[in-house]
């Protein structure tokens, strides 16, 4: 493990209940791998859905955005900056994510132009 939750909070501004990445496992070049363990006690499950907890897809996308933000904002030249999620193309969800699951969050920066970063 490269960064735990305490380390991550020193890099990105997100806090409970909206901190959606637990660990950064590795950063190699333009690729980052993080993880999020899904617990039944998380706030989103109060309403999505009380009888059948399913992690909302938009929160999985946010977890990916936070993962890449840790990689980018941990660089010396980006310290003190904040990253904004501007859009997404072709998101697909292959199955439901439920309490007890562990999300592996893999992102790779493919292009950077005028301060905008493109990520797969």
Predicted regions and their residues:
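Hydrophobic beta-strand-centered segment that forms part of the acyl-chain substrate-binding groove
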Residues: 2, 68-106
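Short aromatic-glycine motifs in intrinsically disordered, low-complexity regions
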Residues: 5-15
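Beta-strand-rich interaction surfaces with strong enrichment in secreted/lumenal proteins
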Residues: 9, 51, 93-95
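Catalytic strand-loop segment that frames the active site of acyl-thioester-processing enzymes
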Residues: 15-55
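Hydrophobic residues on conserved beta-strands that form the core of alpha/beta folds
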Residues: 21, 88, 118-119
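A residue-level detector for short acidic-glycine micro-motifs
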Residues: 23-26, 90, 95, 109-111
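HotDog/MaoC-like acyl-thioester-processing domains
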Residues: 29-33, 97-101, 106-120
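Compact, glycine-rich, soluble single-domain proteins
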Residues: 47-56, 60-70, 85
């Amino acid at each position: 493990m490269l960064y735990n939750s305490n380390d991550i909070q020193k890099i990105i501004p997100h806090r409970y209940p909206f901190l959606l990445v637990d660990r950064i496992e590795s950063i190699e070049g333009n690729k980052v791998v993080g993880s999020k363990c899904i617990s039944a006690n998380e706030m989103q499950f109060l309403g999505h859905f009380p009888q059948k907890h399913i992690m909302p897809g938009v929160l999985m996308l946010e977890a990916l955005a936070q993962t890449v933000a840790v990689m980018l904002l941990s660089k010396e030249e980006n310290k003190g900056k904040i990253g904004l999620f501007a859009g997404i193309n072709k998101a697909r969800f292959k199955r439901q994510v439920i309490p007890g699951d562990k999300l592996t969050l893999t992102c790779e920066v493919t292009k950077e132009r005028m301060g905008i970063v493109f990520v797969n």
